[in-house]
């Protein structure tokens, strides 16, 4: 199957990656970010479990590491002082089977994490203290970084 259009047309490879099997992976919603390291490894989030996955270009799972996230909606890779780091936007909630496009009820815990490639948390940005978020939801979906700032 081809996806995209024009110069951005790609061949869909349905069985490219070996995703660790779990009940949550079969039923989990997956529309999270993907990034590629300087060495060509692909980093993404498990469709059901709070786990980051690192694949080689052939789709072989190289390693995983647990993360304190509901979902890794947006993943941005930066090179800071010669070290590759991840910025991950967690919208604070995860869709569940049987709810269609609705999210489960309850408080959301949106956050942005800055991590190294081993999974160590270097910074955590939580709900900003702004009037708009006092009663509203904080649900970040992507991170933009000004790499000239470091």
Q: Each PLM stretch: what is its role?
A:
Residues 9-11, 29, 108:
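Short, solvent-exposed coil/turn segments
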Residues 14-24, 60-66, 123-125, 129-133:
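A short beta-strand motif characteristic of beta-propeller blades
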Residues 1-15:
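Blade/loop signatures of beta-propeller domains
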Residues 10, 49, 58-61, 119, ...:
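Short coil turn/linker residues within repeat-based beta-strand modules
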Residues 14-50:
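Beta-strand-rich domains and repeat architectures in extracellular enzymes and scaffolds
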Residues 35-50, 56-60, 69-70, 79-83:
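Short, solvent-exposed loop/edge-beta patches enriched in aromatic
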Residues 69-74, 78-150:
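Asp-box/WD-like beta-propeller blade repeats and closely related beta-sheet repeat scaffolds
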Residues 54-55, 115:
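Hydrophobic/aromatic beta-strand positions that recur at structurally equivalent sites within the blades
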């Amino acid at each position: 199957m081809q996806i995209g259009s024009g110069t951005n047309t790609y061949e869909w490879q349905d069985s490219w990656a070996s995703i660790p099997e779990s009940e949550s992976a079969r039923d989990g919603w997956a529309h999270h970010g993907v990034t590629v390291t300087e060495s060509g490894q692909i980093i993404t989030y498990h469709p059901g479990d709070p786990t980051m996955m690192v694949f080689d270009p052939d789709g072989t799972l190289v390693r995983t590491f647990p993360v304190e996230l509901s979902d890794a909606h947006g993943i941005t890779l930066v090179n800071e002082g010669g070290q590759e780091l991840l910025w991950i936007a967690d919208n604070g909630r995860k869709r569940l089977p049987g709810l269609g496009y609705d999210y489960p009820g309850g408080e959301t815990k949106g956050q942005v994490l800055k991590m190294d490639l081993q999974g160590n948390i270097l910074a955590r940005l939580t709900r900003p203290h702004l009037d708009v978020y006092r009663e509203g939801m904080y649900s970040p979906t992507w991170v933009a970084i000004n790499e000239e700032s470091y």
